[in-house]
């Protein structure tokens, strides 16, 4: 398969920065894989490969891209196959286009984690990775402050919510994560006031389940931090929501644990931190399961036209 990768306009030190799919480029003249959002909107590239029988795109931006452009669906239908982290957009577009959409979790490269010392002691109790974008995020930090915690973010925030670590490289983040008992996650993207208008500009938008409850102020977005945590053997506490997108690939109480409210998070975090060894079977099961989604395995599925 011919590999076309372009990362301009994207965060450079993220888990998807290290797929190195170029290593699989065999200069095929009939099959091509595009990686990187900029490739999906590059008309020059699309013209160059338009006659290839199989044209694949790895979509890691859905459904968030619908909030900022009116051309998402047009961009996708150029491809014969799209592998996307949004199962709801995949279902919607499978019903309305000739492109085959296949849901996948966020892929990772195992090379990113080859220096992790899995025998190192857990020096920290809990970690949250990401920006603080809503009141619930602030409440999470308030709870974490009762423990030896880490908050890693790409940018600073006002006091008293200044992250403990700002704009650290991914290698440092993964090392810290591997030394932490619990990772807190929300597979949700907060909606800004202008986002619903952009989304509703798409014909049939209401048939995409990702947009079924915009009144909640959120839409589903599967987070790479879930994958990173599982690879670092850190127990994942995930917010239960209207979608629970994680259940497309992982099982609750087998690979992760739900929290249902801030109060529930308060009590569950206390119990886990103080009884961590009793949750080790979940950590190990998640580590084993997540191997299925390593980028080489995903690529082989793409080659063989297989679903996950």
Regions found by a protein language model. Give the residues of each.
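Conserved acidic donor-binding segment of nucleotide-sugar-dependent glycosyltransferases
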Residues: 256-262, 272-276
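Hydrophobic, well-ordered secondary-structure elements that form the walls
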Residues: 229, 256, 286
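Nucleotide-sugar donor-binding catalytic core of glycosyltransferases
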Residues: 1-24, 28-30, 34-47, 51, ...
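Short, contiguous hydrophobic alpha-helices characteristic of membrane insertion segments
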Residues: 188, 236, 254-260, 301-308
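A charged, aromatic-enriched C-terminal amphipathic alpha-helix characteristic of glycosyltransferases
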Residues: 274-307
């Amino acid at each position: 398969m011919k590999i076309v990768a372009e990362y301009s306009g994207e965060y450079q030190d993220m888990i998807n920065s290290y797929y190195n799919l170029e290593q699989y480029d065999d200069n095929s003249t009939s099959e091509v894989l595009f990686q990187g959002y900029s490739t999906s909107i590059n008309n020059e590239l699309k013209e160059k490969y338009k006659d290839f029988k199989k044209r694949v795109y790895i979509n890691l931006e859905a459904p968030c891209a619908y909030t900022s452009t009116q051309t998402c669906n047009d961009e996708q239908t150029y491809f014969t196959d799209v592998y996307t982290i949004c199962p709801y957009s995949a279902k919607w577009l499978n019903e309305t286009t000739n492109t085959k959409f296949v849901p996948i979790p966020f892929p990772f490269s195992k090379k990113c984690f080859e220096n992790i010392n899995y025998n190192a002691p857990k020096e920290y109790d809990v970690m949250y990775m990401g920006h603080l974008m809503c009141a619930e995020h602030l409440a999470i930090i308030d709870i974490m402050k009762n423990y030896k915690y880490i908050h890693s973010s790409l940018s600073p925030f006002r006091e008293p919510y200044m992250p403990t670590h700002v704009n650290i490289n991914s290698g440092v983040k993964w090392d810290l994560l591997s030394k932490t008992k619990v990772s807190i996650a929300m597979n949700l993207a907060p909606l800004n006031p202008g986002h619903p208008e952009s989304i509703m500009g798409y014909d049939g938008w209401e048939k995409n389940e990702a947009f079924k409850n915009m009144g909640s102020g959120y839409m589903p977005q599967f987070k790479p931090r879930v994958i990173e945590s599982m690879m670092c053997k850190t127990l994942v506490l995930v917010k239960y929501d209207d979608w629970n997108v994680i259940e497309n690939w992982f099982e609750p109480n087998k690979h992760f644990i739900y929290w249902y409210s801030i109060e529930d998070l308060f009590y569950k975090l206390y119990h886990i931190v103080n009884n961590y060894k009793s949750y080790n079977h979940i950590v190990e099961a998640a580590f084993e399961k997540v191997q299925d989604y390593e980028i080489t395995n995903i690529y082989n599925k793409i080659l063989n036209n297989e679903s996950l």
